[in-house]
Amino acid sequence: MRFTPRKAGALLLALAVVTVALTASVASARPARSGASIQACALLPDTKSSTRYTLFDAPYLKAAFKAGGISAQVLNAQGSSSRQKSQAEGCLAKGAKVILLDPFTTAAGLAITAEAVSRGAKVIDYDRLVPKSKVSYYVSFDNVGVGKLQANGLIAALKAKGTYGSKPVIAELNGGITDNNGHLFKQGYDSVLSPLYKSGALKKATAGDQWTDWDPVKGRTIFDQMLARNSNKIQGVLAANDGLAGAVIASLKAHALKPIPLTGQDATPTGVQFILAGWQSGTVYKAIKPQANAAAQVAIDIIKGKPVKTNGKVSGTPSILLKPIWLTKANYKRVFTDKFLKKSDVCIGEYAKYCK
């Protein structure tokens, strides 16, 4: 048979079809992958208790993992323990060898840590330590120190207002009762305030020491009730974070009351605005980028088999502890120079006039 160019082309086409068919057959015989494998996961708790997790932690962690050449996911539980557990399961199923965990609740943290360790993964507690767990490392701020800063900031504000010497009535809006950090903050501020209550220099408001679950809506309801129980005569508030401080401010305004010494935490844009406007005395500024970078570096070192450098221990856990700062009108620009916040985040609308 004569082998013409036309016949050659037909033969090549036929061979190509057979090759594609065989390739497809082999490919379909292979087990499907459940998803791309990853080396690490960062699990954040929610968006309700603070805006920091979406504004700062998530992007900083993603950038740090990328810079370290680590494949990782950063996930938020959106205030659900069951969702956070499912996220952890998904990460482990994809091969994650390190879980960087900021637990929504201590119970969730214990369950996630136990599961991760049983599957050969290391757990780094991020911002919140899970007590009595098999965590490998802890990266956070000195949280007892945070509480002390808040208490001393409240006292300084009372003195500046001239009410410290008149046995002012103080209310405390604590964070989450199931959150170990909430207890550490309280340990810190109670170490300063309790002796003053005992000596009579300060007076704790009636029903004036309550837990809020870090929920500003719940905090508002509780503070409304505190005002009612104390005939609107509360002269200072230790609010555990900026969200709760905002709830206090909303309540004061609703009752046509003037600003009183009031603390916060997290240096949120709204918190800084309230400081500039005179409604909030100060906030604890925790530079999140160094914290995120430090935590990501621990994960990177573990994955690459390098030694992890720590600077302390908390409850026996090797830890990296960073130093918080008390932020007021006097030093609020620090958040701009550190690029923690943009001036355009704070100095806008009715608050623009307060920025110098």
Region locations from a protein language model:
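A residue-level marker of the well-folded mature domains of exported/periplasmic proteins
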Residues: 2-6, 10, 27-356
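Bacterial N-terminal signal peptides
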Residues: 12-21
